[in-house]
């Protein structure tokens, strides 16, 4: 299991650099998570594991070389293609078609539409043998912009990177007769909720059978000061507020209650406290419904 885990991590790192966001705000929001991570670090002895993973290893070098070959020859062009053909969450049919066709061509059996999600899929290595199962998560949805969908969060690269890692590790297992297998999980709509796709897939039992699941995400940083888990993301909370009013014609507005005015005050009040927030804090919002006619409150 450790060997397959090491190969999986090495393959992902060969295709992209990973870094952690570490700020006082994140640490305060994730105290309990950090405590658990600290206990896990002590159990695993991350420094020793890092030294082992970065030591000379012929098998790992073969895997990383294969990752580079796949990326340079085939998967970077796929990433560029997905970038130029963005699809928002739960409509990523073209991206999924590209990713799954490539997996099928490299000895993976694909099941599409898992957990009732049209653009979710599971791809299992058909040459795998009983043993540890390395899971690789890929995402491929685009952001929603005022001028249409666009890729601004590296999801166009994440799929190809994950495929390179999964295929390189799978080929290594077969070539060296190492027990184990690889499963790729295609998870849609990461930028668009609800539904929370990974939660839906988890509740449906899609991830059962995986011994460990890894995922990569592109970043501009190429190194960290020390080995360790760190905190990987800001604490994210999604909140939906609904304001209720009473309709009235604008000429007799005093007979109604203008819910839209309350919504605008909410946004203004949030803006008024931004100057006191730490620079890494982000609060964003959108008005999904603000009335049907301008002459009705």
Where are these regions (language model features)?
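Bacterial N-terminal signal peptides
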Residues: 7-15
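A short, glycine/Asx- and small/polar-enriched loop/turn
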Residues: 127-132, 235, 296-297
């Amino acid at each position: 299991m450790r060997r397959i885990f090491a190969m999986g991590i090495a393959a992902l790192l060969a295709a992209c650099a990973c870094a952690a966001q570490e700020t006082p705000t994140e640490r305060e929001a994730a105290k309990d998570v950090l405590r658990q991570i600290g206990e896990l670090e002590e159990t695993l002895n991350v420094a020793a594991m890092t030294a082992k993973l970065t030591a000379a290893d012929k098998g790992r070098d073969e895997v990383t070389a294969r990752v580079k070959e796949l990326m340079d020859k085939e998967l970077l062009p796929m990433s560029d293609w997905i970038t130029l053909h963005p699809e928002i969450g739960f409509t990523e049919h073209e991206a999924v078609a590209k990713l799954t066709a490539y997996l099928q061509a490299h000895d993976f059996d694909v099941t599409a539409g898992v957990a009732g999600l049209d653009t979710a899929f599971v791809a299992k290595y058909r040459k795998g043998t009983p043993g540890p199962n390395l899971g690789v998560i890929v995402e491929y949805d685009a952001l929603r912009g005022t001028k249409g969908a666009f890729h601004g969060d590296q999801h166009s690269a994440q799929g190809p990177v994950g495929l390179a890692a999964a295929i390189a590790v799978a080929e290594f297992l077969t070539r060296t007769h190492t027990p184990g297998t690889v499963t790729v999980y295609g998870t849609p709509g990461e930028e668009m909720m609800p539904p929370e796709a990974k939660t839906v897939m988890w509740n449906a039992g899609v991830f059962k059978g995986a011994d460990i699941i890894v995922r990569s995400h592109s970043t501009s940083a190429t190194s960290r000061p020390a080995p360790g888990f760190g905190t990987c993301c800001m604490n994210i909370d999604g909140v939906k507020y609904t304001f209720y009013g009473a309709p009235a014609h604008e000429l007799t507005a005093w007979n109604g209650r203008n819910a839209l005015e309350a919504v605008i005050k909410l946004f203004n009040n949030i803006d008024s406290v931004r100057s006191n927030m730490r620079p890494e804090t982000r609060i964003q919002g959108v008005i999904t419904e603000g009335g049907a006619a301008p002459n009705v409150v």
